[in-house]
Amino acid sequence: MKINFSLLDEPMEVNLGTVLVIEDVSVFAQLVKEFYQYDEQSNLTIFDSKIRSIRSSELLLITDILGYDINTSQVLKLLHTDIVSQLNDKPEVRSEIDSLVSLITDIIMAECIENELDIEYDEITLLELIKALGVRIETKSCTVFEKIFEILQIFKYLVKKRILVFVNSLSYFSKDEIYQILEYTKLSQADVLFLEPRQIEGIQQFILDKDYILMPYNN
């Protein structure tokens, strides 16, 4: 994946945990705005190896790690489908669940017989049962470090998202934690950009200095 904007001499490659530091505060703020308002006609361009522009729906922008809701409808749909698939691979467990659902249905319908109204019902599917149970990802006890890993893991689920951008996020973490985060992005083979307003000690990064010169830097 590559990005380009007016101050770059040429497009910049983004892959496997690229860190871009922008020292000019006003430029940093403007670029964050460009990402936030990104569409195919914006000054900021994001495109793949085939020079195909990335749609706004394919960009996942995170400006607040703890405030990001992992349990979106899209994530839950994928999670529930994945659980159904796992259960289908275990015939004994699936059979036990079906038997219990049938038993519960019989009990409820037996009670409904006394009702004066004519009552009918639909059989509940395994997917509907999982939804009804409110199955979701637990996030209440997350630290910032745990939450960013959950976001990175969720990004793999979101097949329609092609690039993940974190804004001003690495300042929350120690050197060792940053190393673990970047290592995980490499192992995940994910296109992830960390957009930062200041240099990060001890890691490889690209710095757009106040003279608007982009240089690789490893301190």
UniProtKB/Swiss-Prot annotation:
GO terms for biological process: defense response to virus. Its cofactor is Ca(2+). Pfam families: Cas_Csn2. Gene3D superfamilies: 3.40.50.11940. One of its GO terms (molecular function) is DNA binding. Keywords: Antiviral defense, Calcium, DNA-binding, Metal-binding. Disruption phenotype: Plasmid transformation is still inhibited. InterPro entries: CRISPR-assoc_prot_Csn2-typ, Csn2_sf. The keyword DNA-binding applies. Ca(2+) binds at E138, E150. The keyword Transcription does not apply. Belongs to the CRISPR-associated Csn2 protein family. CRISPR (clustered regularly interspaced short palindromic repeat) is an adaptive immune system that provides protection against mobile genetic elements (viruses, transposable elements and conjugative plasmids). CRISPR clusters contain spacers, sequences complementary to antecedent mobile elements, and target invading nucleic acids. CRISPR clusters are transcribed and processed into CRISPR RNA (crRNA). Binds dsDNA. When the CRISPR3/cas system consisting of cas9-cas1-cas2-csn2-CRISPR3 or just cas9-CRISPR3 is expressed in E.coli it prevents plasmids homologous to spacers 1 or 2 from transforming. Homotetramer. This is CRISPR-associated protein Csn2. It comes from Streptococcus thermophilus.
